[in-house]
Amino acid sequence: ADFNASYIQLLGSLMGGMVAKHASSEIAAEWVPKVISGDVVIGLGLTEPRGGSDAANLQLKAEKFGNGWRLSGEKTSMSFADQADAAVVFARTSNPEGGSRGVSAFFVDLTEKGISRTHFDDIGTKPVGRGSVFFDDVYVPAENMMAEQDRAFGSIMAGFDFSRALIGLECLGAAQASVDETWAYVQDRE
């Protein structure tokens, strides 16, 4: 059993659901059908180098700029970092002290000027891939903000409750397949 085969579907469902529920109707209408058909991949820009288990302790900044926002910072250990066409990127828009208040989310086309990406040599999730994405004053239009400004963390992260349970089931499935293969080998060996 290959964990990656089901993980790819889980990420598509999670990210497509986030965009359908929290992005503008125009973005959802353009991108969700492409996610469903498998023509595009949307990544999740949440984890940062110093964040660890405190996912809301974000350093990536979003500052008002013209009729939009300018993103500066880094996301790391991001699934599909070097493959995704777009990403839901969480950034600090206020409350520099930290915490989930002051965190907003943006739908970002990862082909925009000022974005660079790296790939991690990862033995566990090669088909999915992981890496870092760097944002160097990347302009994002105001209409690409998802959910409510400064309060996106809680509302969007609620989608993870279901996906976390699915990841646990995926792990159990891979473990069961390993036990089954081992048992079959033990039964047949001489």
Model-inferred region functions:
Residues 31, 58, 74-76, 118-121:
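Short beta-alpha junctions and helix-cap segments that line functional grooves
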Residues 54-56, 80-85, 99-102, 126-128, ...:
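Short glycine/proline-enriched turns and hinge-like loops at secondary-structure junctions
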Residues 1-38, 80-86:
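Internal helix-loop-helix
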Residues 52-54, 69:
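Hydrophobic, small-residue-rich alpha-helical packing segments that form membrane-like cores
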Residues 72-118:
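A short core secondary-structure module
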Residues 38-46:
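A short, Trp-centered hydrophobic/proline-enriched beta-strand micro-motif
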Residues 115-190:
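Glycine-rich beta->alpha junctions and the first turn(s) of the following alpha-helix
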